Amino acid sequence: LGMFSNLAKPAAGDWARWRGPDLNGISSETGWQAKWPDDGPKRLWKARVGTGFSSVSVANGKVYTLGNSGRGRGDEKDTVFCFDAATGKQIWSHAYEARLDPKYYAGGPSGTPTVDGDRVYTLGKRGQLLCLGATDGRVVWQKNVATETKAKSPTWGFAGSPLVIDNTLFVNVGARGTALDKKTGKILWSTGRESSS
């Protein structure tokens, strides 16, 4: 994970979920440097987060992401990381058991954390859904949403990123769309088939 000078300026808007504030992957920021030096922008910091394909979310001066510590030794864990956006100092991390599961790729988590106010939501490859405190990483609630909805895992595991609209948290697990109360984790409804491709 590396942060570059144009991405970590205090004036920059938050990017608190996958594809940004408008869910279109387009930044509304202005004044971006159109031409970079041959060796690229100045790196402000970098951090080791393990294996995975999670993007980063930026909110309130903090950067959140996921990675897996596994090397096929049987002690694999997914970890949610929170860093100071300006310095790269790790503020907190929360780890839970999760297989690396390298199937046709390196493995690790694929979903991006979603920050909503003082909460961070993450979805792991096997359906582990977590709600953590954004400032301290404490577990507010957690559940395996795939188990509870009887969703079957796709070949590469679940890769969706949570979406918050008002008081509802939406996740995609396989062929199921599921809505939960964002404060309690209670499942409000779930749709779809029990199998996924």
Locate each region found by the language model.
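Noncatalytic, solvent-exposed loop/strand surfaces
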Residues: 1-197
